[in-house]
Every structure is written in structure tokens, then in C-alpha cells.
Amino acid sequence: MTEKWWHDKIAYQIYPKSFLDSNGDGIGDLRGIISKLDYIKALGIDIIWLSPIYKSPFVDQGYDISDYYAIAEEFGTMEEFDELLAEAKKRNMHIIMDLVINHCSDKHEWFQKALADPDGEYADYFYFRKGKNGNPPSNYRSYFGGSCWESVPGTDKYYFHMFAKEQPDLNWENPKLRQELYNMINWWLEKGLAGFRIDAIINIKKDLAFPDYEPDGPDGMAACWKMVENVDGVGEFLEDLKKNTFQKYDAFTVGEVFNMKADELGQFIGDNGHFSTIFDFCAHSLSDGAHGWYDAPHVDFKTWRDTILSSQINVQKYGLEANIIENHDEPRGVSRFLPKYAQTPVGTKMLGTVNILLRGIPFIYQGQEIGMQNEIWNDIHDYNDISTIDQYKLAREAGLSDTEALEVCGKMSRDNARTPVQWNAQANAGFTTGTPWLKVHSDYKEINVAAQEKDPDSVLNYYRKLTAIRKAPEYKEVFTYGKTVPAYQDSETVMAYYRETKSQRILVAANFGREAVSTKLEYPVKKVLLSNQNRTDCPEEMLKLDSCEVIVLECEK
């Protein structure tokens, strides 16, 4: 594997709307981010990923972009963005942005021109098709529910959208459209952006025949991702994208890639891959329901553990993946992956350790470093997320009561990760002096940055130790390039693995069970690098782990 500048970096995702509001309008902004750069740097962060800050009607929280060259005024100005770039550079941090190029907003100039002239140049920037016998051109269900086809008033045509109807899909078959996108991407890279997180990118390749699929739900429709899984050729688009943009700037790119074919991993993240890396969603996909959140399966610990470790072994043949516990589209990891008895500061530290020391690029999501958790709301109107509202309806239609449907939303809603960051115990958790756009979590007086700054044993200060160990000069090589070797897999409650190079061996071992466990050490221990129980004595023959204990040991090689 060819060494790259980003291989040993740690990333932090900011969801700007919920990070910090500087002007009291209830919406986080660029000025708020600038004011917290020292806080982010102290966490050991090298790369900051900003969720969309482009001009947008915010139907889908900025993933519906109406102008790729403008900053949403809710977040600030281009001058403030340039200041953010400059201030991050002073601190030796890199900024990457979300790149949403499968679709745009229906308010984008291109789509407005297409609607005005359905036979004109801009109509070919999108997918317009005639209906079939008064019905949509095909039976695809969008990711947010309902048909992927929206009728164009006054015509017999429909336009295609895999997400909300306000997010028409862009026609990547059109070279003019592709060049427009490449020009925009290069404009941002010229400004000094270090790269992009690329949203929903595998969806850009369509089967232009748009064939019907066997219905998979009572609505008579089929999930649109079935087309994605059955069409070939996305790699040609991705190579063209890379060569015309990212490659010229040695940019760091991380793809959001679902529905990839099993044999394509090397094409996506190898030395000559389409992207620098892609997110590893293997653990998150385990809880995908057949019809929605309401029938999400229970995932037992061993399945979760073995899935992650199997993915590690598979990926290291090709390159590095990006590892996450949570992001803006997922519920909080502490609530999702830990049993109730482990949803404590000790358990939170354990979960963070086993994730951040995996092989790959760690991505920490805002609030994860203080152990923010899911929130319980008893009214669907408290939710803002378009996907949650759709999933609530699906659950009710499937026969769940209002209480049961809300319980499902409480577990899986994207708004769990979008509640404002809890900075202190003051009103609105110190996020805003106004009315927050989304309710602040009710536990903000117990879980907040200010309280944890003062507590040397807090989750926040533990995370700082964790990132420092990963980046320490004497361990950087093993944590960056060392192989992941699973250990103690016969245990019902232990997740353990070695990180190994030719000269070093590090053991990461965690007990997710309620009871203490003991196991025989396979190698002599040289040093305790980290413990969420503050242990410093090297174990000799036996490794004893209390409930929710994690320990990181340097072993003889």
C-alpha cells in the first residue's frame, strides 16, 4: 500500500446546524465552528468534515442543494468560510465538505430551466420519462418512501428522484452535466479544501430502461436500491470523476457507499481506488429491517463483533476503510450498540476504544466524545427528520400503535444524532441564546462539555488519551498500518484483537458482558497503554476484565 498523507489522520464530523449557534437564531453556524477549533484540535483531530453548508431549501437538511457555489445564509458567508479554512490551516487541520452530486434541489437553476423547457438542454441534466398507462414509468420506491417518480404538471412526463421529490437525480450519462460538476468540485479544491465526503455516490449509475422489480411491500412497489444492485458501470463514472478532480489535488475522499458488489472493494479503496477510503457500515447494516425500522432485527453481541472483525480482515487486503460509531444519519452508538447496563461513562469509553483503535481512519461524530445518547420524544411532531416521519407512517400502517411507532423512532431516528451539542449546563445546553431549531436533549445538565473538561476521568478526557495513543510516535505505525488479528473469539462477551506489524503487537480487549471474565494471555505484556479502569499494572498469565472494562496492552512480539 502506497503511503498517503491522510493514512494516519483522525477525523471529526460536524453537523453545522447543531454544533454551535453564535448569533442567537437557533441554528449552528460557521462562526460557532471557528470559535471551537481549539476544542477540536485538543481532541486530536486532523480532518474536519462539514455536513452540507451550501445554499439549500433544507427539505433534507442541506442535502438538497440549490447553489453549489454559495454558502447557506443560515450558516454564514463565504468570507467566514474562508476564515474557517485559514484558521484550521493555522492549527494544522484540514477541512473537507460534503459532496452531494447524485441529486440537487428542485430549486436549483438547472432544474427550474428543465421544467420551463422539458425538451431543452437542461432537461437532459435529469431523468424525464413518459408514464405508462397513466402510471409512473416504473415501480420504484424512494429511500424516503413513496414513488421515485414525480409527475410534471401539465405534461405526460415524470422526473426521477431516489430521495425526496424535492431532490431530482442528476443524469450522469450527460457529459455536459458531468463537466459542470467537475468545474464546481475543482473550484472548491482551488480554495484550499482538502477533499470531500461523497454522499450516496453509488446511486449515480441508473439502468436507463428503469425495469420494474418484484414488489417487496404492500404498496406494490420495490426498493429503488434493487436497480442500483443490478446495474453495472458505476466504476467508469467514478474513475472519470477522480481523474478530472480529486487526483489533480491529492485530495482526501471518503465515499458513502452502500449496495457495492462484494468483489468491488479493491476498486473502491485500493492504491488506485475510486476513493481514498469508504465508510464501513457493516455493523450498522445488521439492523436494517426488511420493510423499515419497525421490523429491524435484534443483533446479538457475537454477530456484531464478528461482523466488524471479519470486515477488518477483508478490507486490509486492499487499503483502509473509515470507521464510525455514529454519524448524522444514524442513532447514537451508545444507545444502539451497548446494553442498558453498559450505557455509562465506563461503557462509552469501552465502545470508543474498540472502534478508534481498529485499522482504518477513525471518524468521531460531534457529541460522541462526551457520550451523547438517543432522546425519547412522545410526539411525532417533535421530530424534524423527513426519514423519521416516513418511518413512523410505515410503522403505523404495519399495525403498530402510536406508542410503539414512537418507540421505534426513538431507537432509530436520525434526529438522535442531530440534537444540539451539549456545551454546558446553562439554558439550551449553551448551544444557543435563542430557540434551538431542534429540541436539546433532556440530559444536558448531566452530559456536557464543560462538566467533562473539569473531570479528569470523563469520557471527553478519555477520548483525548485515546487519540493521543493512536498518534503517539512510538505507536503511530502499528495503529496506522498494522494488521488486525482477531483474538479470543470463542468468548461470548469479549471483543479483542491485536494490531500487529513485524516489530510490534498491541492487544485491545474489552468485556461487553455483565459479569467479569478471565482468559489466559497469549503473549507476555510489556506495558499498559490505556485502561478505562485506570489500571497500570501489567497482567502476567491471566487477563481479567470486569464488566465493561477495556484495556490496551503492548505485548511481546
Task: Describe the predicted segments one by one.
Residues 48, 196-198:
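Hydrophobic residues within beta-strands of alpha/beta enzymes
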Residues 94, 98, 195, 252, ...:
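Hydrophobic "anchor" residues on beta-strands that sit immediately upstream
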Residues 217-220, 286-288, 329-334, 439-447:
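Short acidic (Asp/Glu) and glycine-rich catalytic loops that position anionic groups and cofactors
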